[in-house]
From Swiss-Prot:
Ranges annotated as spanning the membrane: none
UniProt binding sites for substrate: 145
Molecular function as annotated in GO: oxidoreductase activity
Organism encoding this protein: Mycobacterium tuberculosis (strain CDC 1551 / Oshkosh)
Protein name per the record: Uncharacterized oxidoreductase MT0971
Enzymatic class: oxidoreductase
Matching Pfam families: adh_short
Origin organism lineage: Bacteria, Bacillati, Actinomycetota, Actinomycetes, Mycobacteriales
PROSITE patterns noted in UniProt: ADH_SHORT
Family classification: Belongs to the short-chain dehydrogenases/reductases (SDR) family.
Length: 253
C-alpha cells in the first residue's frame, strides 16, 4: 500500500551493522533524518561520520542502546527524538541469532534469543506507540523473519519462536490501530547477507546485503501490513511454509 506520506525522521535500532546499517545508508541517500542506536557505539560513530560526509544536509543522531536494558529504551528514544526534531517512523530491528537445540542443556542461548528478539521488541513497541500517540501519527516497522511463519527444528527453534511472537504482536497492532493514523508493518526477511546470517549453517536462497536492503526499504516505504522480502522467492515460499507439516520445515532452518 502506497500512502503518499514521507516519513522524514526515522529511528532504527540495531543500526551498527547488517540490515540496520544498510537501511540507514539507504534512507540517508533519500535525505531522511536518522536516529540510530545499537550497543556498538564505535561502529555507530563511524557510520554517522560516513553518512554526514556524504549527506551533510541531513540530521543524524546516534546513541548507545542495549535493548535488553528496558529502562533505557524510552530515555534513549526521547533523547534521539529531541536531537533530530521528532520521530515519525521506528524500525524495530535489533536482534540476535543465538540458539541451541531444545533439550540440549543450553537454555541460556535460547533464553537470550527470546529476551532480545521478543521481550525487548515489546519494550521498543510500547515506547514507539507512546511517542506516536502523543504526536498523533507514525509508522511502526517490525522486523520479523520468514522463520517466524512456522516452527523449525534444530538450533533455530527459539529464533523462529521469537520472530513468530513479533509477527503476532504486529498482527494484533494492525487490528488495534486499523482506524487510527498509526500504521504498523511486519516484514519477514528471507536469508539476506549480514553478520547474523554469516554465522548460519544455512545459505538457502541467500541474497547479498545490497539486494536485501533495497527490498526492505522499498517494502517499508509502501507501508504494507505485512510483507516477505525479497518478494521472490519468499512470498510464495511463506505460503508453502504455512501448510507444510513440521517435519518438512528442516530445510528452511
Amino acid at each position: 500500500m502506497l500512502t503518499g506520506v514521507t516519513r522524514q525522521k526515522i529511528l532504527i535500532t540495531g543500526a551498527s551493522s547488517g540490515l540496520g546499517a544498510g537501511m540507514a545508508r539507504s534512507f540517508a541517500a533519500q535525505g531522511r533524518d536518522l536516529a540510530l542506536c545499537a550497543r556498538r557505539t564505535d561502529r555507530l560513530t563511524e557510520l554517522k561520520a560516513e553518512l554526514s560526509q556524504r549527506y551533510p544536509d541531513i540530521k543524524i543522531a546516534v546513541a548507545e542502546l542495549d535493548v535488553n536494558d528496558h529502562e533505557r529504551v524510552p530515555k534513549v528514544f526521547a533523547e534521539l527524538s529531541d536531537e533530530i526534531g521528532g520521530i515519525d517512523r521506528v524500525i524495530v530491528n535489533a536482534g540476535i541469532g543465538k540458539g541451541a537445540r531444545l533439550g540440549s542443556g543450553k537454555l541460556w542461548a535460547n533464553k537470550a534469543t527470546i529476551e532480545t528478539n521478543l521481550v525487548a521488541a515489546l519494550v521498543q513497541i510500547e515506547t514507539a506507540l507512546d511517542m506516536f500517540n502523543q504526536r498523533g501519527s507514525g509508522h511502526l516497522v517490525l522486523i520479523s523473519s520468514v522463520l517466524g511463519v512456522k516452527g523449525v527444528p534444530g538450533v533455530k527453534a527459539a529464533y523462529a519462536a521469537s520472530k513468530a511472537g513479533v509477527r503476532s504482536l504486529g498482527e494484533s497492532l494492525r487490528a488495534e490501530y486499523a482506524q487510527r493514523p498509526i500504521r504498523v508493518t511486519v516484514l519477514e526477511p528471507g536469508y539476506i547477507e549480514s553478520e547474523m546470517t554469516a554465522k548460519s549453517a544455512s545459505t538457502m536462497l541467500m541474497v547479498d546485503n545490497a539486494t536485501g536492503v533495497k527490498a526492505l526499504v522499498a517494502a517499508i516505504e509502501r507501508e504494507p501490513g505485512r510483507a516477505a522480502v525479497p518478494w521472490w522467492p519468499w512470498a510464495p515460499l511463506v505460503r508453502l511454509m504455512w501448510v507444510l507439516p513440521p517435519r518438512l520445515t528442516r530445510r528452511f532452518a
